């Protein structure tokens, strides 16, 4: 996958379920949500940066430490190799892998899913609604 495509998909994912607090620091996006989910509590080294790489990593670590959160980086193939190497030297480890699958939905209709006890339906939305948010909060045990 090309870097431009990765960037476009990552922007969609970042905005799909935003963090409670967000800081932009020299092209990096720092998300803070009290520890609920990696995606809402991680550092996206997303855009081009100009500051010294090691100083940026130390700054980010301090920001998360102040909130008693681990500094977690969302890494993709588009991330500069120098950052990956620096994080490894500083003792960071790969903790979780995420596969992002995508396809064109133009002209696609969701099949009705059925099981003996229930009748499920796939609903495609452009924005989350209250019912969806409440369900997600119950699944990951966030007070609602």
Please state what every model-predicted region is.
Residues 49-130:
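Acyl-donor-binding surface of acyltransferase catalytic domains
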Residues 16-18, 23-29, 91, 98-100, ...:
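Bulky hydrophobic/aromatic packing residues
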């Amino acid at each position: 996958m090309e870097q431009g495509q990765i960037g476009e998909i990552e922007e969609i994912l970042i905005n799909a379920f935003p963090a409670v607090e967000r800081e932009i620091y020299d092209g990096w996006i720092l998300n803070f949500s009290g520890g609920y989910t990696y995606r809402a509590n991680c550092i996206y080294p997303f855009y081009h940066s100009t500051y010294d790489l090691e100083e940026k990593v130390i700054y980010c670590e301090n920001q998360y430490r102040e909130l008693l959160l681990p500094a977690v980086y969302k890494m993709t193939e588009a991330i500069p190799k120098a950052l990956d190497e620096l994080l490894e030297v500083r003792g960071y480890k790969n903790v979780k892998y995420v596969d992002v699958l995508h396809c064109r939905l133009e002209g696609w209709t969701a099949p009705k899913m059925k099981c003996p006890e229930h009748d499920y339906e796939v609903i495609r939305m452009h924005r989350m609604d209250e019912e969806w948010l409440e369900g997600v909060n119950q699944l990951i045990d966030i007070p609602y």
